Design a protein with these regions (language model features):
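Short pre-active-site segment immediately N-terminal to the catalytic Zn-binding motif
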Residues: 465-478
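Short, small-residue-biased leader/transition segments that mark boundaries at the very start
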Residues: 1-6
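N-terminal helix-rich structural modules
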Residues: 17-212, 217-219
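Active-site-proximal, well-structured secondary-structure segments within enzyme catalytic domains
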Residues: 151, 183, 190, 194-235, ...
Length: 478
């Protein structure tokens, strides 16, 4: 029958998928780094599903253990659960930030609600929490050292903050809220990324006045990449946007670029995020109140060094007054220059970078464009390596390993005695599937399995000015 043929084909496809999914096998790569040359978007959802099933079994084993709850059979067992889920999640989240595509976005929309529900199933489980609480209540009499005691307190606090003390009706509402909150960042981030990628400012040769040769070169290569001949293109990515705002003499074009950046996902945009922001605020506030906090800010800061929103505002206010006074002084200096160029004009946000650079040149004889050749990315990276070696004795050796994008470079990190410390990925340049900003993350966290140290695999991700055919990547003092 046709249904039998379908079942046989489906079964074959599933077996093939299992056989080909890199997350279902040990990674035979240098130091066990992710096999990016084999990982594909369709691998993640099955990997998440298997990883969640494995952790569910690990949690069930803790719950069904008939021995008296102890640090080893409850706290340590819980802490060691979910390693596969962590591994898949670290790789997935990194790729969704640094090299996303439509297939990954679709996988993320499917995975996030499943992961949120899985997390709630664990953190709101009464049997598991009762065992954790039993150890927590007896922590002072179990002969634990300071590290073990801290782990008990952290895990107990994590469950309480997640809603373990709520009644069944409250827990059900919390699950609904968490499910909705799981999808909102995905939708919000996708909109920002698409709005950023959709905008291009096309320039003619008459609109290049003031732009250094390196900035023109990047704009020219971007235009060629987009198939635009005899043109120059500026995008909303920081390495393209900020140099244009800094050097372009075309005030109307600076305004156009600045407003395009600020108005992303705003009213009238195809990717309007305003309703999502309202949903964020409403759901977070309801969650905080459900958990016994007066606001979401109070909920977040309660687990941080600040402790309360009031402490955060106290610090901000200490900085705000002198910072505002200094900003007004700088604006007055820049406005004086603006009046020379455009008498009667009002100083606008898109004037800030341009006139700040003019003030630096006029007052301090500092010119970023002149200084940049001294800060090629290669020189800065080698300088950082040299400093790390002088301070800590560690060295960095190029490593041939799979990468998720051709722009990435990989290094093995060695201790002073030559032993392996970890692997470091660099991903320096902007591209259409990459979030803005800079961050450090891990593909594998450092941990210990018994006495064996599992070395970390770390990535440093930036959005520096990319090289052109004629010039290397040049950084600024900032």
């Amino acid at each position: 029958a046709a249904s039998d043929v379908y079942k046989r084909q489906t079964g074959c496809n599933q077996r093939k998928e299992v056989a080909e999914n890199p997350f279902f096998e040990e990674w035979e790569t240098p130091y066990g780094v992710p096999p990016f040359d084999r990982i594909r978007p369709e691998h993640f959802l099955p990997a998440f599903q298997r990883a969640m099933s494995i952790q569910e079994a690990e949690i069930d084993a803790i719950k069904s253990n008939g021995d008296q709850p102890s640090f080893e059979n409850v706290i340590l067992a819980y802490d060691r659960s979910g390693l596969m889920l962590e591994q898949v999640g670290l790789v997935f989240n990194m790729l969704c930030s640094a090299d996303v595509n439509d297939q990954l976005l679709a996988a993320k929309e499917q995975a996030m609600p499943l992961l949120a529900a899985h997390r709630d199933n664990i953190l709101l489980d009464e049997v598991l929490f009762d065992k954790i609480k039993a150890v927590y209540d007896r922590r002072g009499s179990l002969g634990l050292d300071a590290v073990q005691t801290r782990l008990v307190e952290k895990i107990y606090g994590k469950f309480v903050r997640a809603g373990a003390l709520l009644d069944p009706q409250q827990k059900e509402r919390l699950r609904q809220i968490n499910g909705e909150l799981a999808l909102l960042p995905v939708k919000f981030g996708n909109n920002v990324l698409r709005a950023t990628n959709d905008f291009v400012l096309k320039l003619t040769d008459k609109q290049l006045d003031g732009l250094p040769a390196s900035v023109q070169g990047i704009a020219r290569e971007k235009a060629a990449e987009l198939g635009l001949n005899d043109a120059w293109v500026v995008t909303l990515d920081a390495p393209s946007r900020i140099p244009f705002l800094t050097y372009s003499t075309q005030r109307d074009l600076r305004e156009q670029l600045y407003k395009a950046y600020i108005d992303r996902c705003n009213e009238g945009s195809e990717y309007d995020n305003r309703s999502l922001v309202n949903d964020f605020a409403r759901l977070r506030n309801e969650k905080a109140r459900l958990l016994g906090y007066p606001s979401y800010a109070a909920y977040v800061t309660a687990d941080e060094m600040a402790g309360t929103p009031a402490a955060v505002y106290e610090l901000l206010n200490e900085v705000w007054t002198p910072a505002l006074d200094r900003a007004k002084e700088e604006m007055a200096e820049m406005n004086t220059m603006l009046q020379r160029d455009v008498p009667g004009a009002t100083f606008e946000p898109w004037d800030w970078w341009y006139y700040a650079e003019k003030v630096r040149k006029d007052k301090y004889a500092l010119d970023d464009a002149t200084l940049r050749p001294y800060f090629s990315l290669e020189n800065v990276r080698e300088g950082a390596f040299s400093l790390a070696n002088r301070l800590y004795g560690i060295t960095f050796r190029p490593l041939v390993a799979p990468v998720y994008h051709k722009d990435c470079s990989v290094y093995e990190v060695l201790d002073v005695d030559g032993t392996h410390l970890g692997v470091l990925y660099f991903d320096f340049f902007p591209r259409s599937g990459k979030s803005s900003g800079a961050w450090c993350t891990a593909f594998r966290s450092q941990r210990y399995e018994g006495d064996e140290r599992i070395a970390p695999v770390v990535a440093i991700v930036c959005n520096f000015t990319p090289p052109t055919k004629l010039t290397p990547s040049l950084l600024t003092l900032d």
